[in-house]
A protein has these predicted regions:
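Bacterial N-terminal signal peptides that target proteins for export
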Residues: 4-20
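Alpha-helical cap/lid subdomain in secreted, periplasmic
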Residues: 8, 12-13, 65, 75, ...
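Bacterial N-terminal signal peptides
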Residues: 19-28
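Serine-esterase "nucleophile elbow" of acetyl-processing enzymes
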Residues: 33-85, 95-103
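N-terminal helical cap/lid subdomain that shapes the substrate entry/recognition surface
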Residues: 86-90
Length: 221
């Protein structure tokens, strides 16, 4: 009886091992078929309240719209929204470490509006943006610089000087460049919130569409 008992146990154990191994083989394709988010190239949108989606519901900011556009076009990027309401270019410098830790392939930089609204000197804005772009360039990160403008009451001289600062910085750092992120929103009803500053969900979709042509040469499939 004892030998039979030993054989029976061996057979059961062997059968259990074979069945378990078979189940692992069946499960393996399910585990490996899922592409980890970390393996997708990261695109960081780094900016102020325009990037953050101030006043909008979840999923309505322009980085959210950009993610949808990229997904539809077959690009497997993971868009990371690093927008902070009220942020100035000084805050952009302070937050660089957080952005660099994400190891992004591309960064869209959108700052400057709050500098103007707070009356910060244009030289300071230019210097801070230069520092941000230098850090990204030194890390071999592709850059898209998104320009902004300010209301007419800031004066034509200041507005033109700000626009020139964006142009010269984009050229210096070999960045893709969109001179005016709000270009597609001008005189289009329903694109700006009641505060007269921030885009609506519709406006965010248009901003994403405005950025995409300049962004595409930086993308890889």
């Amino acid at each position: 009886m004892f030998p039979v008992f030993r054989y029976t146990v061996f057979v059961d154990v062997r059968r259990t091992i074979i069945v378990s191994f078979g189940l692992l083989l069946l499960a393996a394709p399910v585990l490996t078929a899922q592409k980890p988010a970390a393996s997708r190239p990261v695109l960081v949108c780094y900016g102020d309240s325009i990037t953050a989606g101030y006043g909008l519901d979840d999923g309505q900011s322009f980085p959210d719209a950009l993610q949808r556009d990229l997904d539809r076009s077959g690009y497997h990027y993971l868009v990371n929204n690093q927008g902070t309401s009220g942020a100035t270019t000084k805050d952009a410098v302070a937050g660089l470490r957080t952005v660099l830790r994400l190891h992004p392939d591309i960064v869209i930089v959108e700052f400057g509006g709050n500098d103007g609204l707070r009356g910060l000197p244009l030289d300071e804005t230019r210097r801070n943006l230069d520092q941000v772009l230098t850090a990204l360039e030194n890390a071999h990160i592709k850059i898209l610089l998104a320009g902004i403008t300010l209301p007419p009451n800031f004066g034509e001289d200041y507005i033109q000087a700000l626009a020139q600062a964006f142009r010269s910085l984009a050229a210096k750092h070999h960045a893709a460049f969109v001179p005016m992120i709000y270009k597609g929103l001008v005189d289009v009803p329903g694109t700006i919130q009641r505060d007269g500053i921030h885009p609506t969900a519709k406006g965010s979709e248009i901003i994403a569409d405005t950025l995409l042509p300049a962004l595409k040469p930086l993308l890889r499939k």
